[in-house]
Every structure is written in C-alpha cells, then in structure tokens.
C-alpha cells in the first residue's frame, strides 16, 4: 500500500511539474516590402539549420468551374526551373542537404526548404527566382509533362484507391456547384486535359505575385543579413493586376443529408461530416482536438 501511495505521489509531482512549466514563447519580426511581400523572421540558434517557406494566398478555391486543378498543377510547375536557373529545382538544394517540398489546399499553396544555415541565401535566391521568373522558363513540354504527372497522381490517390473518391462526393454534397469548395484540389481529368498554356500563364500572373505571398524565415540566421538578402532577391519583383477574392457565402445545411454509393471495396465505410467554423475562430483549436476522437 505504501509503495502504491508513493507511486501516486510521484505521478502527481511529475505531472504537476509538467503543467506548471513556463509556456514556450516564440519571438518574431514582421515587416512588408514596398511590393507588398509580407516577411516574417524568427531566429532560433539551437541547431545550424534554417527554414524558408513561401505561402501564396491561392488555392483550389480560386479556380473556376471547368478549370479545376490549376492550383495543384502549379505546385508541380514551380519545381521545373525558372529564369536564372532553368533546371530541376531540387538539384542544387538537395546537393546542399536540403529538405524541400510544397503542398496545396483549398485556401493556400506553400513551398519550403530546410537547409544548413550557410545555404540560406541559396534558398532565398531560388524562391525569388521562381516567384519572378517562372514564366520565362515555362514551355509546352514542361506543362504536358507535369499535367501527366498530376493525372497519374489522381488515378493513384483517388480513382484507383479504395474509398479514394469519398471526399469528392462529400464536397459535392456539402457545397453547390458554384461554390469553390465543391471540388477537390486535384481537379478532374477533363479539366486538367483542357488546361492550355495561356490558361496557366494567366493563373500565374494573377496569383503568384509578391503582394499575394508571405515569406517566413526561421532558424539559425542573422536578421540583419536576412533582411539584406530578402531585399536583394525579392525587392525588385513586381505585382500583377489586383486580385479578386471569391466571396461565396457559407451554405447553410437546414437538415441532415444522407448519401449511399457503391464502390469496388471489400468493406463498407461510414463518413460523418459537419460544417465547422472559419479559420481563426476561437473554437477552431477545440474542434480540431474533438476531430481526433
């Protein structure tokens, strides 16, 4: 009994220490270039690495019906070379030991590099060059190549994957055809096939501009030096035409909706979906936790 009581008291002591621990505070500096690019700097010298992320405020919600999949297709095109480095984007950074990737959601597209801190300038140069000079190196061959890659990705992850089209059907059920959340980021095979070079160039000119992007640098670097590099590589980039944001109201579901569909799977699956709150809402974090249960 004494040993059990002692163990219980030890647990109380340990967990009490954890919960009274001081909160981690992340300091940052935020400013904006003349061309509208938002820059966020966070120094952390605990390891000799630096992370660069560029987030463009464009996603599949900015697409139009019959032109779906453009935002995700552009994620692929951004790794195909640009004005001053017309080659595989991964090559020089991976030779420096970098970790590189990008992702697309309905609301944003982001690209990042985690590099040894002495290669931070290289990462900034590469990001700035494709922000300002992607169209200078874009060709029909590159577009056709990446279009086929994205089509294969759709077949692999959606069409030929068990339950792969479930969320497409859910999106169509939750949102009307005119709403930008009606379709998924991958787009349809028909829309991807219909994408022309002019369509792709127009999408880039409209959304891939400094004033529609945020640049974040975090890790082992000197802020003064980083600011000089940011001005050097991003400061001279220009913006396109003003951006019109989608303004579709959130559809209200007045009653429960049910749907049954057959798929080539061995076991049935049930999906239960609720409309949630917008990003930044005070209840967002709590609902994210509930979602895990």
Question: Model segments located where?
Answer:
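Bacterial N-terminal signal peptides
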Residues: 6-15
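Non-catalytic beta-strand/loop surface segments
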Residues: 19-60, 84-119, 157-212, 236-281
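Short pre-active-site segment immediately N-terminal to the catalytic Zn-binding motif
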Residues: 59-67
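Solvent-exposed, non-transmembrane alpha-helical starts
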Residues: 65, 121-124, 160, 228, ...
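Active-site SXXK
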Residues: 68-82
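M16/insulysin-pitrilysin zinc metalloprotease superfamily fold
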Residues: 81, 114-146
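Non-catalytic, conformational "gating/processing" segments within enzyme and secreted inhibitor domains
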Residues: 140, 147, 201-233
